[in-house]
Amino acid sequence: MKTLLLTLVVMTIVCLDLGYSLICFISPHDSVTCAPGENVCFLKSWCDAWCGSRGKKLSFGCAATCPKVNPGIDIECCSTDNCNPHPKLRP
C-alpha cells in the first residue's frame, strides 16, 4: 500500500511539472521568467508616424492570454521559451 501511495505521489509531481515558468523576450536581446499564470509570450507590432523611415514599433512580453487584436496592430503569440524574438533576429 505504501508503495502504491509513493508511486501516485511521484506520478502527480511528474505530471504537474511543478515550478515550470515560461521565459519570454521583453526586448530584442533581453528575456525574463514570466510570472505564474502567464503562459503566453507575445510580440506586438504597429506603425506610427515614422513607420516609413524607422520601421514598425515593437512590444514584447508575457501574458496570461494572447492580447486582443486591434485594427492596425499585429500580434503573434506562442507558448515555448523565447519564442517571441525580434523579427530580424529569428533563425
Curated annotation (Swiss-Prot):
Keywords: Acetylcholine receptor inhibiting toxin, Disulfide bond, Ion channel impairing toxin, Neurotoxin, Postsynaptic neurotoxin, Secreted, Signal, Toxin
Source taxon at top rank: Eukaryota
Annotated signal sequence range: 1-21
GO molecular function, one term: toxin activity
Keyword Manganese in record: no
Pfam family for this entry, one: Toxin_cobra-type
Compartment annotation: Secreted
Tissue/organ expression: Expressed by the venom gland.
Keyword Signal: yes
Cysteines paired by S-S bonds: C24-C41, C34-C62, C47-C51, C66-C77, C78-C83
CDD domains, per database record: TFP_snake_toxin
GO terms for cellular component: extracellular region
Family annotation (InterPro entries): Snake_3FTx, Snake_toxin-like_sf, Snake_toxin_con_site, Toxin_cobra-type
Family to which this protein belongs: Belongs to the three-finger toxin family. Long-chain subfamily. Type II alpha-neurotoxin sub-subfamily.
Function noted in UniProt: Binds with high affinity to muscular (alpha-1/CHRNA1) and neuronal (alpha-7/CHRNA7) nicotinic acetylcholine receptor (nAChR) and inhibits acetylcholine from binding to the receptor, thereby impairing neuromuscular and neuronal transmission.
Record protein name field: Long neurotoxin OH-37
Organism encoding this protein: Ophiophagus hannah
Source species taxonomy: Eukaryota, Metazoa, Chordata, Craniata, Vertebrata
